Structures are given as structure tokens and as C-alpha cells.
Amino acid sequence: VEPGDDIARLDLARLPAVTQVESTRFVPVTFRHGHRSERSLIRGYDGRAVLYRVVDAENHATTLEGMGLVITDRLADKLGMRVGDTLLAEVEEGRPRSVALTVGATVREMMGLNAYMDREALNRALGDGDLSSGYVLAVERGREEGLLEAIKSLPRVAGAFSKATMLRNMQEISARNVRIMSTILTLFASVI
């Protein structure tokens, strides 16, 4: 998704049922440190995000504000990095450029080679204005469906989803899979 001016956040905040909006920016990069490299994505969130936070394996939230680049312990190991080291991030969107970023912290997550940064600091490091590529919304309970329909009709919206709907769908799929497996195991048991 091409990033755009963050002014769209104000338009989203005015939609009915929206109680809070946080901007995000995802930037595809190749990290380089010495002879090691790894393709990844820098996930730029509001420094003091509430709706979408970086949470470690022990369920502790990490504040991004003033931290520089925050990477997972697995990405740090793969690149041979420690806190305080500087790596090169080759940006793979927009105009070609490379930026040196200092690792401010590592976070232990269950999976992934992830990298995070305060969105405003990320934009400054890239020499960009106030850009965003996505938004996280808090919505009044029970009004999600109407809002999703309204959002899908907006220009430049690539997709919209509800966490509650996704969770409900996953639960339905899991329940169906349990029923199928129970039926199969019952058939096997009756044959034996």
C-alpha cells in the first residue's frame, strides 16, 4: 500500500461510531549488518499507541516513543545485532534510499523477524513528511458492520476488517474442524 498524507486520519475520526484513530506506516526494507542481510518490514506505530501495541512473549507492551528501531530477538540474532548497534535499512518503496538506524531495544516475540519504530521517527529517518499507510480504529460496540461498509466505499481504502468478526470466524472454523475430526475418529473407532 502506497503511503499517503496522514490527514486522512482526521477524516476517519469524523466517521460515525469511531472513538479513536491511530496511524501506522509499514515500510518494506532489506536490513544489512556486515555481511548479513534480511528482508523485513519496519512497522511504524504511534509512539504511545493504545490500539495496536508491540507486545512481547510475556505479554508486556513496549513503548516505541524515543526508542529508535526495536527489533525482535530473532532478527537481532540473525543479523548479529545488539542494542546500540547500527544497521543499514535499504528502503524498497518509493524512491530508492538507504538509512542507518540504531537498534534501541530488542523484544522477544513468539515468532517472526519483526522491526518496529515510532511512526513519526520513521518518517523523519526516511526524509518523508507525515505519511501513513494504514489506520487502526476504535469503534463503538455493535456499530462495526455499518462502519466497515462506510469505510469500504472510501477512496484509497485497500481493505477493512473487524477483529471481533475475525475472532468469531476463527472460532467457527475451529469448531467445525473439531466436529470433522470427531467424526473421523469415531469412524476409525467403529472399524476397529
Model-identified regions with their sequence ranges:
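Juxtamembrane segments of multi-pass membrane proteins
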Residues: 1-66, 70-74, 82-85, 169, ...
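Secondary-structure transition/capping motifs at alpha-helix termini
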Residues: 15-19, 81, 93-98, 154-158
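Residues embedded in well-ordered beta-strands within globular domains across many folds
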Residues: 22-25, 88, 136, 159-161
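Hydrophobic secondary-structure segments that place a key small or acidic residue at a functional site
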Residues: 25, 61-122
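Small-residue transmembrane helix packing/gating motifs
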Residues: 53, 63-64, 106-155, 159, ...
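A short glycine-leucine-enriched loop at secondary-structure breakpoints
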Residues: 78-82, 126-129, 173
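Juxtamembrane "pre-transmembrane" interface segments
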Residues: 158-180
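Hydrophobic alpha-helical transmembrane segments of multi-pass inner-membrane transport and secretion
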Residues: 175-192
